[in-house]
A protein has these predicted regions:
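N-terminal glycine-rich anion-binding loop in soluble enzyme alpha/beta folds
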Residues: 1-68
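Short Gly/Thr/Asp-enriched flexible loops that form oxyanion-binding sites at enzyme active sites
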Residues: 76-98
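Short acidic/histidine-rich motifs immediately flanking catalytic phosphotransfer sites
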Residues: 69-73
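Short beta-strand segments at enzyme active-site cores
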Residues: 42, 74-77
Length: 101
């Protein structure tokens, strides 16, 4: 699982929601996953998705590509504001039969 920030990783901060939840903290909220599969977390970015740019997309693509060498699939957590743009970029750049969600 590759985390990039967004609302899913946000907690209350001084100026509203701030992405600061780690991947392991997210997994700890879903104890039912333990024993079903092995999940490794990579806390790659910690951004509000409105701040995602092509540079971050390239970093995500590289991390996903590296992760696929040792895993059966990749889950990327991401905010909703630019999710469609990131997904489109990853669709064009990751040529893999493995699932990237």
């Amino acid at each position: 699982m590759i985390t990039t920030g967004g609302t899913i990783a946000s907690q209350e901060g001084e100026d509203g929601l701030e992405p600061k939840t780690t991947g392991q903290q997210m997994l700890d909220l879903i104890p039912e996953l333990q024993g079903l599969c092995e999940i490794d977390c990579v806390d790659l970015l910690n951004l509000d998705s409105t701040n995602m740019q092509p540079e971050e997309w390239a970093v995500m693509a590289k991390a996903a590509f590296e992760g696929m060498k040792n895993h059966d699939g990749i889950v990327i957590t991401h905010g909703t504001d630019t999710l469609d743009e990131t997904a489109y970029f990853l669709t064009l750049t990751l040529n893999t039969p493995k699932p990237v969600v």
